[in-house]
C-alpha cells in the first residue's frame, strides 16, 4: 500500500483514515470544538445554539416547522419545542398560511431580530478573541474561510446533500 502513495501522502490509519497528514481529522475536531466556542457567548445572552440557528434561518424569511426541521436536520417534535420556547420569549411569531389554514409559518419579531443581532455580535467577538491567537493575516483568513464554509453548507443544502 505504501508503494501506491504519492510523495508527501500518508497511509490511512485508524487515527487518521484519510491519509492526509491529519488535516481532515484536525478540521473535524476543530469543528466540534468551534461549536463549544459558539455556545459560550450564546449562553451569556440566554440563547442555545439550536435557538440561534433557528433565528438565523428565520432571518432569511419565514418558514413552516417542517421546512425548519429539514433545513436544521432536527426532528419535527424538536423544532416544535424550540419554536414554543422562542414564541414564549416573543422572539418569533406564528402566522396562519392564508392559502392553507392548517399550515403555519414562523417569522422573527422585532425582539427576535434584536436577539439575533446580539448573538451575531457576541459570536463574532468570540471568533475574534480566538483568532487573536494566530497571526493577524491568518485570523482574517480563518474568518473568511469560515464564512465560505457557510456558503458551501447552504449550497449543499440546496442540492439536497446536507
Where in this protein do the model-derived segments appear?
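N-terminal helix-turn-helix DNA-binding core of bacterial DNA-binding proteins
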Residues: 36-78, 160-162
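DNA-binding alpha-helical recognition surfaces that contact promoter or target DNA
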Residues: 56, 81, 144
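Exposed, interaction-prone assembly regions rather than primary DNA-binding/catalytic cores
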Residues: 138-162
Amino acid at each position: 500500500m505504501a508503494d501506491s502513495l504519492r510523495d508527501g501522502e500518508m497511509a490511512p490509519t485508524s487515527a487518521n483514515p484519510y491519509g492526509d497528514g491529519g488535516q481532515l481529522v484536525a478540521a473535524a475536531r476543530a469543528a466540534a470544538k468551534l461549536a463549544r466556542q459558539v455556545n459560550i457567548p450564546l449562553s451569556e445572552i440566554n440563547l442555545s445554539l439550536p435557538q440561534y440557528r433557528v433565528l438565523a434561518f428565520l432571518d432569511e424569511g419565514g418558514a413552516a416547522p417542517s421546512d425548519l426541521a429539514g433545513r436544521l436536520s432536527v426532528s419535527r417534535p424538536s423544532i416544535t419545542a424550540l419554536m414554543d420556547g422562542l414564541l414564549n420569549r416573543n422572539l418569533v411569531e406564528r402566522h396562519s398560511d392564508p392559502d392553507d389554514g392548517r399550515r403555519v409559518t414562523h417569522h422573527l419579531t422585532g425582539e427576535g431580530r434584536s436577539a439575533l443581532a446580539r448573538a451575531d455580535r457576541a459570536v463574532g467577538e468570540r471568533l475574534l478573541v480566538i483568532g487573536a491567537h494566530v497571526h493577524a493575516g491568518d485570523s482574517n483568513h480563518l474568518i473568511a474561510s469560515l464564512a465560505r464554509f457557510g456558503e458551501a453548507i447552504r449550497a449543499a443544502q440546496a442540492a439536497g446533500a446536507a
